[in-house]
Amino acid sequence: VVGGDECNINEHRFL
């Protein structure tokens, strides 16, 4: 899912 910069940071944190 793509949401924006915040989503990118969240995904990186999850990874």
From Swiss-Prot:
Expressed by the venom gland. It is found in: Secreted. GO terms for cellular component: extracellular region. The keyword Ion transport does not apply. Keywords: Disulfide bond, Glycoprotein, Hemostasis impairing toxin, Hydrolase, Protease, Secreted, Serine protease, Toxin. The keyword Secreted applies. Glycosylated. GO terms for molecular function: serine-type peptidase activity; toxin activity. Its EC number is 3.4.21.-. GO terms for biological process: proteolysis. Snake venom serine protease that may act in the hemostasis system of the prey. Belongs to the peptidase S1 family. Snake venom subfamily. This is Snake venom serine protease. It comes from Bothrops cotiara (Cotiara).
